[in-house]
């Protein structure tokens, strides 16, 4: 993880905090939240070069959502763990 500690990033990811990170020239945003009907939602959006929701899961708890997210090939066909060393954690 560039510009950050991977353990801190993963802790924030697990807790659903809003995170912004860049991989391969693309800016990503992820967050988890509880809707009014008490359903937990975790989502991944791309902010640059295009704005779109890439992936979303709902109805699972944060732990299960987090584990499923980490297994998905969402980043140019790679999982988060495959891109982690080349990913920059940004705050903007």
Stretches with model-predicted labels:
Residues 33-56:
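Short, surface-exposed, low-complexity cationic segments
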Residues 28-29:
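Short, isolated positions in well-ordered beta-strands
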